Amino acid sequence: MRYNQYSYTKASEEVMLDELARLGFTIQTTNSPKENLHHFLQKILFRYQDVNYVLSSWVADQKTDLLTFFQSDKQLTEEVFYTVALQVLGFAPFVDFDDVTAFCKEIHFPITYGNILENLYQLLNTRTKLGNTLIDQLVSEGFIPESNDYHFFNGKSLATFSSHEAIREVVYVESRVDTDGDGKPDLVKVSIIRPSYEGQVPAVMTASPYHQGTNDKASDKALHNMNVDLSCKNPRTITVQESSIQTIEPQGQASLVEKAEEKLGHIGSYTLNDYLLPRGFANLYVSGVGTKDSEGMMTSGDYQQIEAYKNVIDWLNGRCRAFTDHTRQREIKATWSNGKVATTGISYLGTMSNGLATTGVDGLEVIIAEAGISSWYNYYRENGLVTSPGGYPGEDFESLTELTYSRNLLAGEYLRHNQAYQAYLDQQRKDLERETGDYNQFWHDRNYLIHADKVKAEVVFTHGSQDWNVKPLHVYNMFHALPAHIKKHLFFHNGAHVYINNWQSIDFRESMNALLSKKLLGHSSDFDLPPVIWQDNSQAQNWMSLDDFGNQEDYSHFHLGKGSQEIRNRYSDEDYNRFAKSYQVFKNELFEGKTQQITLDWTLEQDLFINGPAKLKLRLKSSTNKGLISAQLLDYWPAKRLTPIPSLLEPRVMDNGRYYMLDNLMELPFADTPHRVITKGFLNLQNRTDLLTVEEVVPNQWMELSFELQPTIYKLKKGDQLRLVLYTTDFEHTVRDKTDYHLSVDMEHSSLSLPHKKS
């Protein structure tokens, strides 16, 4: 374990004494540090009748148990304090450590012994070995009453709301869109879990088209065959325009009622939301248009879908109506809401956070967009190519639409609406232009970057450098598209497409508590986060604050060599079938230099801290009238590295409230690996200038082009080896072209440029 503490805010002596007193601690500045520590321990051991037994079970040093120490005239020293503090946090002397000073240095222990008041205050804010902060662990065990009222400590709301007394209800928000064309505003189901509280509370909203269930069978049937050739496109200039959606006004009258009539049963939830509920934040789960128990079509990422989610925020602020059921006869207002909202969730859920932020809707104070898409084109396409998300060959937009159109899971809805839905889906297939892979109006209408100037909320991103599903380009582009005055924070980790709120190494959920307590509850606090919090790839459990993602002025340039080298596209039938059957086999052989490729290796002569997108400048020609170029850059030598999928450290040990929704403690393993993909990228040679320009590829005519690979942050050391592989067809991401052509690369006039921080 290594501490990386971002949620803690230094406080004045007056504030510390006051907050400690509110918790029942009577720390006296006139007492000795030893006396104050003794009182502190007696207080936190409230579950025990015989506190002396516990003290006798702990040690003060390698020769003295803690009870004996307090009964002696020995002074409290730095070594004794650290030994006791570590035991309070769940570490075991003689098991986890022998040398306490060395161990504190090893785990980057955040407390510096000196001021016992500040030390004990910070100790309560420090994470235990099992993930909860000490104060959260104590509260979960009943340290203070479950009062259904707010109680703050170090700027964070404590779990003083009963999750068992929470109000669970369902309402149906009247949206301002009519996506199924029936002349009525689409109703959207909202599942609510909110604290039992006499006043008003804020909400964390998760906009998830998956929440009401998914139609996996229909989605699987809609997958595309990737074993097709790359198309030769007609040269043209693509034009797009900014469009707006049609909205519909509220219809009819309804009587006003005070209580919802539909009770919410068990639902799947997000553990960050679970953590926030007993701290006084209502949880809202919204599936949106086209989903089970809601109305409308699944418009998949456009601003009609986003408008319906936005209308839920409007309802929380009194600007839209909600009904108790589909009859629309009884209206219910969100009188419990203080109007302030944060959004949460990963992938499609984080995508909707991005989209919602670009509406500038009043009441949306914070988005927590985890691995969210910023432009749908960049999810299913790349530089004029059809590209499948990592791990999902053959998926395209209509298979996602089929997956999330869960209205068809209700047989009656299927009978009434499936014919119209199939016609809608047929039109979507045409609009995708899968044959060309080109950008067009369909994709432009699902590009949130062009509306980023409207963002008013504070923005938190999380994203993984090894996320080849929603690639790092999405967060990089959104991060830089935001207006300069918007506060933004990026947690850039080394995982894949994963959550980070239950990781041992980073106090992410506590940081979100501090931010939302400040922004949604109005609690006065000096809490702030740096622009970028980056997980250091060179060692286990180490995070660093950075000023920016990209925007580096310095580049390291690597020339590709001399002469010309050739990349053949067509494989033997045997190899083609092997690779098409398992893209992982292809990847393994690609990295080992065994496929049809150009392989270049460099040994670094100095440390290199990459920050931003790598740039490839190539001079090449194709033997035919089309072609694609693929590139991957690897950290290529056997070493210990962070692996991309979190592993389980301890099951169900993090209490999100008070005996409520236990979460697993997870972390990225630091393990021996043969190599690591740093970045990758793909380009259709007919789109070598830009997305809106489709050009002719003249056979055997040299072309000069440059394109950026996926942005990343990655630390390399002197002596490390870089491997660049250039090839054509990628059996995981691109169409699997069988055309018998080759690319010739002019090595002398081609180069790789890596942006880096100054050393």
UniProtKB/Swiss-Prot annotation:
GO biological process: proteolysis
EC number from the UniProt entry: 3.4.14.11
Primary location: cytoplasm
Annotated localization: Cytoplasm
EC class: hydrolase
Active site: S347, D467, H497
Presence of keyword Phosphoprotein: no
Gene3D superfamilies documented for this protein: 1.10.246.70, alpha/beta hydrolase (3.40.50.1820), Galactose-binding domain-like (2.60.120.260)
Protein's UniProt keywords contain Cytoplasm: yes
Reactions performed catalytically: Hydrolyzes Xaa-Pro-|- bonds to release unblocked, N-terminal dipeptides from substrates including Ala-Pro-|-p-nitroanilide and (sequentially) Tyr-Pro-|-Phe-Pro-|-Gly-Pro-|-Ile
Family matches, as InterPro entries: AB_hydrolase_fold, Galactose-bd-like_sf, Pept_S15_Xpro, PepX_N_dom, PepX_N_dom_sf, Xaa-Pro-like_dom, Xaa-Pro_dipept_C, Xaa-Pro_dipeptidyl-ppase/CocE
One Gene Ontology term, aspect cellular component: cytoplasm
Gene Ontology molecular function: aminopeptidase activity; dipeptidyl-peptidase activity; serine-type peptidase activity
Keywords per UniProt: Aminopeptidase, Cytoplasm, Hydrolase, Protease, Serine protease
The family this protein is said to belong to: Belongs to the peptidase S15 family.
Function summary: Removes N-terminal dipeptides sequentially from polypeptides having unsubstituted N-termini provided that the penultimate residue is proline.
Subunit structure, as described in the record: Homodimer.
PANTHER family: COCE_NOND FAMILY, PUTATIVE (AFU_ORTHOLOGUE AFUA_7G00600)-RELATED, PEPTIDASE S9 PROLYL OLIGOPEPTIDASE
Name under which the protein is recorded: Xaa-Pro dipeptidyl-peptidase
Gene: pepX
